[in-house]
Amino acid sequence: MANHSSSSSDQGTKKKGFKFRQLPEHAYQGKAKRIKQDLILKAKTKKHFYKNVRPEEYIKKGSGERKRKFSKKSHLQELYERSEEKRRIQQEKEDAKVQKRLEIEKKQKDREQTRNMLSKKTKRGQPIMRNQINHLLAKVKQTS
């Protein structure tokens, strides 16, 4: 129980980590020195390499990067072409719908016209035979 009450009093204060002090000059700093020397060596070798490389090799290296950028452009070009193809197909579908609708309207008008022509009657209520015969002749001509 005593431990439990002491932990509740410790809750108000946070535990602090180890306190670091600055190392004296004579302390061991081998790892840090090795890392620093390694970085210096890498920088020197890079500098030496770029001094000795011919300008032609720079151009070759640069052209390789350009080709890669060009391939990215071709990818974008490919996406653009796909979207254009989709747009073109959609436009063709819309045109086909409009054309079909116009044909349907034309057929309906023709049917209405023939129905009116065939339904005409004389004063006595008899159908006008001239219209009937013309309609039958038109059908025969259409089939042959």
From Swiss-Prot:
Highest taxon of source = Eukaryota
Q: Which residues form a coiled coil?
A: 72-124
UniProt keyword Coiled coil present? yes
InterPro entries in the cross-refs: Fyv7/TAP26, Fyv7_fungi
Residue ranges, compositional bias (Basic and acidic residues)? 75-114
- GO terms of biological process kind: maturation of SSU-rRNA
Q: Where is this region: Disordered?
A: 1-33, 62-132
Location in the cell reads:
Nucleus, Nucleolus
Where does this chain mainly localize?
nucleus
| Bias type Polar residues, positions | 1-11
Which Pfam families did the record assign? rRNA_processing
A GO term from the CC aspect: nucleolus
Which keywords fit this entry according to its UniProt record? Coiled coil, Nucleus, Ribosome biogenesis, rRNA processing
So what does this one do? Involved in the processing of the 20S pre-rRNA.
| Protein family (similarity comment) | Belongs to the FYV7 family.
Mind telling me what this protein is named?
rRNA-processing protein fyv7
